[in-house]
Amino acid sequence: KLKNFAKGVAQSLLNKASCKLSGQC
């Protein structure tokens, strides 16, 4: 369960980072 939670957090962080990089936020 903890691994799944960490994966979800990392995924959302990646999504935020790529959205900022592409300037589409």
Swiss-Prot record:
Its main location: secreted. Disulfide bonds join C19-C25. GO terms for biological process: autophagy; defense response. Expressed by the skin glands. GO terms for cellular component: extracellular region. The keyword rRNA-binding does not apply. Pfam families: Antimicrobial_2. It is found in: Secreted. Keywords: Amphibian defense peptide, Autophagy, Disulfide bond, Secreted. The keyword Secreted applies. Signal peptide: none annotated. Cytotoxic to cancer cells, acts via the activation of the lysosomal-mitochondrial death pathway and autophagy-like cell death. Does not show significant hemolytic activity. Belongs to the frog skin active peptide (FSAP) family. Brevinin subfamily. This is Brevinin-2R. It comes from Pelophylax ridibundus (Marsh frog).
